[in-house]
């Protein structure tokens, strides 16, 4: 059995401890500490949770699937191991019509984002080359593998 990775945390006033709903979940749910109304414009939500992520790892903030079902867009964010401030969630709820009732309120204690802790390769060098090794894909972009 491997030793679990320890990530230290600090809660600011009103912050809610990130939790995994199930032991094998990849991400820790991040909770909104106060009611927030999401609009067309991105809203910055302070979770009031600070982390000390070990060197060689980073945190990725991303949407929970339930947020996507509700039409909420959560921008992906990277938390570097040397950052000690509070985690923020950048979210918006694009409206379909001009009815202000279509905006979504996220209530205190609800979770629309999750935090995934991942390792990364620290010793990386970029090497400028005149040409890159050919592949069967080459420069095929969006939908090049079939897509929808």
Label every model-predicted segment.
Residues 1-148:
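Non-catalytic terminal segments and appended small domains
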